[in-house]
UniProtKB/Swiss-Prot annotation:
Enzyme class, first EC level, given as a word: ligase
Protein name, as recorded: Threonine--tRNA ligase 1, cytoplasmic
Species this chain originates from: Homo sapiens
Role according to the record: Catalyzes the attachment of threonine to tRNA(Thr) in a two-step reaction: threonine is first activated by ATP to form Thr-AMP and then transferred to the acceptor end of tRNA(Thr). Also edits incorrectly charged tRNA(Thr) via its editing domain, at the post-transfer stage.
Catalytically driven reaction(s): tRNA(Thr) + L-threonine + ATP = L-threonyl-tRNA(Thr) + AMP + diphosphate + H(+)
One Gene Ontology cellular component: cytosol
Domain of life: Eukaryota
Length: 723
């Protein structure tokens, strides 16, 4: 497999292995006719014999491997010299270049360490454990808990699954990268497809491959040789022709699988202790709808079967919290094929949407932001000025109007630049904080659309701060305080990362240094823990990335604080400084707290599991009459709560018992259930209980409304308890 974002460099793997691959000779001796019969459990059986390309590929590989081993042996004999390997604690270990491997050094420390190490890191670059060291270097030994080690572990697992897919389906493998939680592999099949019924037989074959402890081997090969090796696979040839710009590149082998890959990988397939195939879908080659349709299979793996059990439990919990399911069950929102990627918010979903916007709007007033309204459609000349047309036009909805090209806006910043520039500006106006809830559109591929998390139509709590260079620190402090206020109301903890100047940046290095220093000062004064992502900033300015943690431990990036030195230059934005200089350039701070309102609703839906806090709940109050004689009073009660701007409903179903009505309201997640009978009717009261069946007893209507208004205004997280 070969991914543009794969880790590098890759490495040669040691370990004993049969010359052709475990089980291969036996497989080749099988009958001439391919057997595609299903396995006993209804899945698909392994092909017998394997596709011819596997044997041809292996023959070429074995010749190249013999040449490679000969060259490496000669290099180890002639060029080897003593080197120093520096460990993280500063200790130095003696080694020999072209001979000593990271695995050998790990064994020298302890066998337990060697066994638990997933991958090495040499001079800050991930490196195969069995690949010889080449010079003096630093060495880290990464375990599965490390994010880079997880990526390698799942990458190797993808190769195991890829081998099984070739042996079962016989198609052409495409991309197969590690992803945030696991891995996938795409395969092109000329006929037929993948079924979830195949998973058990695929998993069984993966377990067999794992049991064989097939070594991962790395080989650097000339591009033209690889074009011959992969001539059966037009997708690999496309990768070689379109993405490989060097005379050579690398392949990895495990068993009969040989694939284009930068690597690195675990030592052998036996390092994967638990593997599960859990999902399949179809996709397009490189996500382009006019290209071939591919079959994608997803998997997950761990170094301990207990971890897989925990993952399965977590998946079940996540499934129960899926915002698409809850949105359906609670009648909040839905999607329709006639407007893909654009959500229909039903009345109760619209309440949540508007409550979030009003929350942010109320904070804007406190914090000196001014809300603006900008057009949805702009001439393409605007996007050419901003630079988005050159880099982002494929993701924009564009159309012709009177022989001019226009587009729906995918972001607000260029429009805000026009707003800043429509008249001369003075230093007295800065910082100028412009906020916009405008509708945005991005042309996401239909196959990538996923509920509310990936949409085409959305709104953001988008704001741009135009400020002087010396004002950056205070503005960033304000942004950080803003996000802490909002996230504490939701009950989210969060992580902060400062991303600094990348290698390819625009602007003056002095300006970058000054801005980064102000960001650091702001973060330090903010008082929350933060980490440095050196070199990970955008080319136009440093940024602070914020990830929130939900109720089941998942992280989501919503908020962003991004400095921009380039957009003011592109739009030639200036202001008159206090010393009379009318060519002073402002800095733009892009910031959002919710990010996409749609995506935040998805996160909140799953975080709360549909059990909304009172202020945000679309079902705040349910009035339940004891019997028909109390229906009229119940309707009056419901109207009073409605007039007080609560989401209040009434259950007048004569076919339900009182207990059934109360239980229905609790299951529907009404925060407060107000029971009214003859006693309450006479006294003008309500009897209050919560969705968790906490009974607060009898209160007057006015007293209840006043208390609920307080809880709503303060956005209490536990209103039912605090009542």
């Amino acid at each position: 497999m070969f991914e543009e974002k794969a880790s590098s460099p890759s490495g040669k793997m040691g370990g004993e292995e049969k010359p052709i691959g475990a089980g291969e000779e036996k497989q080749k001796e099988g009958g001439k006719k391919k057997n595609k019969e299903g396995s006993g459990d209804g899945g698909r059986a392994e092909l017998n014999p394997w596709p011819e390309y596997i044997y041809t590929r292996l023959e070429m590989y074995n010749i190249l491997k013999a040449e490679h081993d000969s060259i490496l042996a000669e290099k180890a004999e002639k060029d080897s010299k003593p080197i120093k390997v520096t460990l993280p604690d500063g200790k130095q270990v003696d080694a020999e270049s072209w001979k000593t491997t990271p695995y050998q050094i790990a064994c020298g420390i302890s066998q337990g360490l060697a066994d638990n190490t997933v991958i090495a890191k040499v001079n800050n670059v991930v490196w195969d454990l069995d690949r010889p060291l080449e010079e003096d270097c630093t060495l880290e030994l990464l375990k599965f808990e490390d994010e880079e080690a997880q990526a390698v572990y799942w990458h190797s697992s993808a190769h195991i699954m890829g081998e099984a897919m070739e042996r079962v389906y016989g198609g052409c493998l495409c991309y197969g990268p590690p992803i945030e939680n696991g891995f996938y592999y795409d395969m092109y099949l000329e006929e037929g497809g993948v079924s979830s019924n195949d998973f058990s037989s695929l998993e069984a074959l993966c377990k067999k491959i794992i049991k064989e402890k097939q070594a991962f081997e790395r080989l650097e090969v000339k591009k033209e040789t690889l074009l011959a090796m992969f001539k059966y696979n037009k997708f690999k040839c496309r990768i070689l022709n379109e993405k490989v710009n060097t005379p050579t590149t690398t392949v990895y082998r495990c068993g009969p699988l040989i694939d284009l890959c930068r690597g690195p990988h675990v030592r052998h397939t036996g390092k994967i202790k638990a593997l599960k195939i859990h999902k399949n879908s179809s996709t397009y080659w490189e996500g382009k709808a006019d290209m071939e349709t591919l079959q994608r299979i997803y998997g997950i793996s761990f170094p301990d079967p207990k971890m897989l059990k925990e993952w399965e439990k977590f998946q079940e919990e996540a499934k129960n919290r899926d915002h698409r399911k809850i949105g359906r069950d609670q009648e909040l929102y839905f999607f329709h094929e006639l407007s893909p990627g654009s959500c229909f918010f039903l009345p109760k979903g619209a309440y949540i949407y508007n409550a979030l916007i009003e929350f942010i709007r109320s904070e804007y007033r406190k914090r000196g932001f001014q809300e603006v309204v900008t057009p949805n459609i702009f001439n393409s000349r605007l996007w050419m000025t901003s630079g988005h047309w050159q880099h982002y036009s494929e993701n924009m909805f564009s159309f012709e109007v009177e022989k001019e090209l226009f587009a729906l806006k995918p972001m607000n910043c260029p429009g805000h630049c026009l707003m800043f520039d429509h008249r001369p500006r003075s230093w007295r106006e800065l910082p100028l904080r412009l906020a916009d809830f405008g509708v945005l559109h991005r042309n996401e591929l239909s196959g990538a659309l996923t509920g509310l998390t990936r949409v085409r139509r959305f709104q953001q709590d988008d704001a741009h701060i135009f400020c002087a260079m010396e004002q950056i620190e205070d503005e960033i402090k304000g942004c950080l305080d803003f996000l802490r206020t909002v996230y504490s109301v939701f009950g989210f903890s969060f992580k902060l990362n400062l991303s600094t100047r990348p290698e390819k940046f625009l602007g003056d290095i002095e300006v970058w240094d000054q801005a980064e220093k102000q960001l650091e000062n702001s973060l330090n004064e903010f008082g929350e823990k933060w980490e440095l992502n050196s070199g990970d900033g955008a080319f136009y300015g440093p940024k602070i990335d914020i990830q929130i943690k939900d109720a089941i431990g998942r992280y989501h990036q919503c908020a962003t604080i991004q400095l921009d030195f380039q957009l003011p230059i592109r739009f030639n934005l200036t202001y008159v400084s206090h010393d009379g200089d009318d060519k002073k350039r402002p800095v733009i701070v892009h910031r959002a707290i919710l990010g996409s309102v749609e995506r935040m609703i998805a996160i909140l839906t799953e975080n709360y599991g549909g059990k909304w806090p009172f202020w945000l709940s679309p079902r705040q109050v349910m009035v339940v009459p004891v019997g028909p004689t109390c229906d009229e009073y119940a309707q009056k009660v419901r109207q009073q709560f409605h007039d007080a701007k609560f989401m209040a409903d009434i259950d007048l179903d004569p076919g339900c018992t009182l207990n059934k009505k109360i239980r229905n309201a609790q299951l529907a997640q009404y925060n407060f259930i107000l029971v009214v009978g003859e006693k309450e009717k006479i006294s003008g009261t309500v009897n209050i209980r919560t969705r968790d069946n906490k009974v607060h007893g009898e209160r007057t209507i006015s007293e209840t409304i006043e208390r609920l208004q307080q809880l709503k205004e303060f956005r209490s997280k536990q209103a039912e308890e605090e009542f």
